[in-house]
Amino acid sequence: MNEMSSVRLPFRDGYYDVRPTKIVALAKNYAEHAREMGSEPPEEPIIFLKPPSALIGPGSSIILPRRSKRVDHEVELAVIMGKRAKNVPASKAFDYILGYTIILDITARDLQAEARKKGYPWTISKGFDTFAPIGPRVVDSRELDPSDLEIGLKVNGKIRQLGRTSQMIFKIPELIEYISHIMTLEPGDIIATGTPPGVGPLRHGDRIEAWIEGIGKMEFDVLAEDSILC
């Protein structure tokens, strides 16, 4: 893996190297977010994949690609798998979780809209390098109940997103059951569990602060691709 595919985060008394084989993300898993996107809440989980190459950790910057004119933030609770999971029932799902952290599902919204209009997958809008910031630490699954945590995001000090994980349509055990009946989840794989309402555009020079109760907060600068190219 290249260096952007591996992020080292504090975990227990040491560190954990985040090296997923895949990032499985949820679309429209908060009802109000589904509505702000012009949809009704789904009847079953809507999943898509983000590439591990999109991962960055604290201290890195989110890069706005020249190809997109509208890049949005989405703050999400990330579940990191601790054991190989295949056909796991919801009743046993928590036994397979290593821990929790925060992930941003950065999205090129204009490219997503174009892809939807053509009936194409969303990968082009979700897969750019730096489009999966993660941090600030991994919290042991035994030390945190993820069922009702405040989750939020500020841009330049102003609150954009604020919700609670209890507002998820499909809860973590349901997600693990659903996903593991489709694909095997390997140790280290990440499930990004969806975002509360309030998603919005990012611009060059913005400063993002994202937080989840019990995990902490992380901050990232936003830079236009043109500003870092020679």
Swiss-Prot record:
Listed GO MF terms: acetylpyruvate hydrolase activity; metal ion binding
Domain of life: Archaea
Signal peptide region: none
Residues at which a divalent metal cation binds: E74, E76, D105
A Pfam family: FAA_hydrolase
Keyword terms, alphabetized: Metal-binding
Entry keyword Protein biosynthesis: no
Protein family membership: Belongs to the FAH family.
Name of protein: Uncharacterized protein PH0643
Organism from which the protein derives: Pyrococcus horikoshii (strain ATCC 700860 / DSM 12428 / JCM 9974 / NBRC 100139 / OT-3)
